């Protein structure tokens, strides 16, 4: 439900805070209505299964590729997935998940975009720009990924509002 609301607000170009607090200006309700109609027709399938395993994701992905011809999978986020039993630690578990998502993308021949949390190390640096070593719980993510993209929002760490809402993309 939260993800759907975020998507709706992004599509409508409406600040989600206004929707949540009931303070959406009346002139923006039209934008929200148009976006809701557009999204209803969009081929987007949301699955918020908690602690989904790669095996469960693979089965669902195969079915959606066959039945709905989906063209991309987004995992939000990698560290919320459950890895196989019997691994020694969380780093190994994330490594197995990362490798399995890469194999899934090759198997079903569509992109699998996996979002990841960052470690707290990024907050210890002066510039706070994320780096590959900041990917949380595994170095395997950077090895398995075809591309790693970071969003850097300097206004989050600053008192100045001049660039609020803007983000730098680091590839």
Show which residues each predicted segment covers.
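Hydrophobic "anchor" residues on beta-strands that sit immediately upstream
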Residues: 72
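Cytosolic-facing regulatory segments adjacent to core modules
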Residues: 1-69, 83
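Phosphate-binding/switch region of NTP-binding enzymes
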Residues: 92-171
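Charged, alpha-helix-enriched surfaces in structured cytosolic catalytic cores
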Residues: 2, 23-27, 34, 41, ...
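Conserved P-loop NTPase nucleotide-binding/switch module
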Residues: 4-15, 78-102, 125-128
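Conserved nucleotide-binding/hydrolysis micro-motifs of P-loop NTPases
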Residues: 1-2, 9, 13, 50-53, ...
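Short, basic, glycine/proline-bearing loop/turn elements
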Residues: 42-49, 87, 118-126
């Amino acid at each position: 439900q939260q993800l759907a609301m975020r998507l709706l607000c992004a599509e409508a170009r409406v600040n989600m805070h206004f929707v949540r607090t009931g303070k959406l200006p009346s002139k923006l309700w039209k934008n929200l209505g148009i976006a809701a109609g557009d999204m209803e027709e969009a081929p987007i399938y949301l699955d918020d299964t908690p602690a989904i395993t790669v095996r469960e994701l693979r089965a669902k992905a195969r079915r959606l590729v066959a039945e709905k011809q989906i063209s991309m999978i987004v995992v939000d986020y990698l560290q919320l997935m459950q890895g196989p039993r019997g691994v020694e630690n969380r780093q190994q578990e994330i490594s197995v998940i990362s490798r399995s998502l890469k194999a899934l993308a090759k198997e079903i021949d569509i992109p699998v975009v996996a979002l990841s949390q960052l470690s707290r190390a990024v907050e210890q640096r002066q510039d706070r720009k994320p780096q590959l070593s900041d990917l949380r719980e595994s170095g395997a993510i950077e090895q398995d990924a075809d591309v790693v993209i970071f969003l850097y929002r300097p206004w989050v760490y600053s008192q100045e509002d001049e660039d609020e809402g803007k983000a730098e993309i680091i590839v």
